[in-house]
Amino acid sequence: MTRTITVEGMTCEHCEQTVEEALSDVGGVESATADRESESATVEGDADDDELVAAVEDAGYEASA
């Protein structure tokens, strides 16, 4: 399953990598990509939306599903 979440606060490539790594650590995530220009992240897998949002927020960014 593919889902997209909104991520605010990414300003550079390092930010994108940080969000991708945080999302990849969530159980059920097969892959994750972040895009600062669209302020979003796309996740492949069966992870829970609340867990995805929490992982991004724990990494220091605002997120919503």
PLM regions and their residue ranges:
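Acidic, polar-rich N-terminal leader regions of halophilic archaeal proteins
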Residues: 1-65
